[in-house]
C-alpha cells in the first residue's frame, strides 16, 4: 500500500475523531442549555400564582374588579394548560434531536423554548402584578368602607348615648342618620352592579355627611344646655330675686321688667324651635343675644342693690352733715357781721356766704325730707343715690368755701395789729435813716435819695391815715402795709449805697493826689469827680469817674478800698 493512501486513511480517521469530539462537546453544551430551560420552566411553574389567585378570590370581588380577576385567572389557566405543555413538548423534542446529533434542529428547538419561556415569564409577571393591584385596591376600598362604617356606627352610638342632650334637634338628627344609611345602601347596590366610580362617589358623600353630622352633634348639646337649662335657671333666679326686691321696697327706673322676662322666654322657645334646622351659627348668635338681655337684667338688679347700700349710708349722713354746714354758716355770718362794724370788708365774703345759705336752703327743701324718710321712698335707690351724692358734694363744696372765707376774715384783726406795729417800726426807722444821713456831713443829699425818702414818708402817712378811720378798709391796710415794707427796705439800701459812694469817693480823691502831678488823666478825672461830688452831689458818678482813672494807673486799687470799707462800715442802729 502506498504511503499516500496510508496518509489519506490517517487523515480520514483524524477527521472522524475530531468530528466525534466536536459532536460530543456540542451535545453536552445543548444538554446544559436544555437542563437550564427545564429549570426555568420548573421555577416559573413553581411560582405561588395559584396561592395568590386563591387569596384574591377569597376577597369576594364584585363588579369591574371581579371581571378583571376572571380575565387574569383565565390567562393563568391558559399558561398552565397550553404554554407549559407546549414548552414541555419542545424540550422533549430538543433532547431527542440532541441525542441523535441533530444539532441544528436541536438548537432551533432550544431557541424556541427560550423565547416561549421569556413570553411566559412576562405573562406571569403581568398576572402577578395585576393580582397584587386587585388585592391592594380591594383592601383600600375595604378600608374606606370600613372606616366610613366605623364613623357611622360611632356616631350612631354617640347619639344614642346622649339622646337627651339634643332636645328638639333629635327628629332632624334621626332624619339625617337615615339619609346616610340610605347612601350606604346605595353604595352597596352600585358596587354590586359593577359601577365602582358612582359607588365611590356615593361612599364619599356618605362619609362627608357622617363627619359633618358628627361635628354638628358635638356642638348641639352646649347650645341645647343653654336653652333648656342655663337660661331657664337664670330667668328663675332673676324672677325670684325681682319679687324679693319688690317685697323689700325696691323700685326700678325700668317699668317693663315683667315684659322683658316674657320676651326672653319667648326668645328661648323660638330659638329652640329654630334649632331643628341645625343652623348652629344662627342659634349661637341668638343665644349670645339672649345672654346679653339676661345680663342686662342682672345689671339692673345689682345696680339697685349696690345703690341701696350707698343711699342708705348717705341718708343717715346727710342730715348731720347739713346741720353741721348750716351751723358753720350761721357762725360765719355772725363773725362777718361783727367785723363789719369795725372794718370795711370785701363784698365777696358776704355774697359768698349768701350763696352758701341758698345752697343749704335748697338741700333742706328738696333732699332733707327724702333722707329722713328714706325707708318710705318710692323712688329707685339709684336715683336716690345720685340725689344724695349730689347734695353731699354741694355741702362739701359749701364747707370748703366756708373754710376759705373763714381763713380770709379770721386774720383781719391780726392784720390791723400787725400793720400798726409795722407802722411804728417804719416811722422809727425813717427817723433813724434821717439821723444816719445827717451824721455823715455830706456836701449835699442826692435828689434820688430825697425823692425816695419823701415818697416813703408819704406812704407811711397814708397807712397811718387808713388806720385812723372809724371803719378800717382792711384790704387797703394790707396793700399799704406791703408798699411801706418794700419802700422802707429800698430806702435803707439806698442810704447805704449813697453813704458808701460818698465815703469811697472822698478816700479815692485823697489817694489820687499821689498821681495827679504826673498823670494828666488822673488830674482831669479828679477835677471832674470833685465837681460831681461837691456841686452836683452825684456821688455815684463821682465814684465811677475817679475809680476808673485810678484803675488805669493802679489796677485793683478800687477793690482794695471797697473791701476795706465793707469791713468797717457803720450800720444804721434801728
UniProtKB/Swiss-Prot annotation:
On the tree of life, the source organism's domain of life is: Bacteria
Q: Name one GO biological process term.
A: septin ring assembly
- Give the disulfide map: none
> InterPro entries this protein is in?
EzrA
Locations listed in the record: Cell membrane
Q: Protein transport among the record's keywords? A: no
Gene Ontology terms, cellular component aspect?
Answer: plasma membrane; septin ring
* Keyword entries, A-Z: Cell cycle, Cell division, Cell membrane, Coiled coil, Membrane, Septation, Transmembrane, Transmembrane helix
Hey, what's the signal peptide range on this chain? none
Extracellular side of membrane = 1-7
Transmembrane ranges, per UniProt, are: 8-26
Main localization category: membrane
Question: Is-annotated flag, keyword Transmembrane helix?
Answer: yes
Membrane topology is: Single-pass membrane protein
Spell out which residues lie on the membrane's Cytoplasmic side. Answer: 27-574
Where does this protein have coiled-coil stretches?
102-141, 274-350, 459-520
Family listed = Belongs to the EzrA family.
Q: What does this protein do?
A: Negative regulator of FtsZ ring formation; modulates the frequency and position of FtsZ ring formation. Inhibits FtsZ ring formation at polar sites. Interacts either with FtsZ or with one of its binding partners to promote depolymerization.
Q: What is this protein called?
A: Septation ring formation regulator EzrA
- Classification of source organism: Bacteria, Bacillati, Bacillota, Bacilli, Lactobacillales
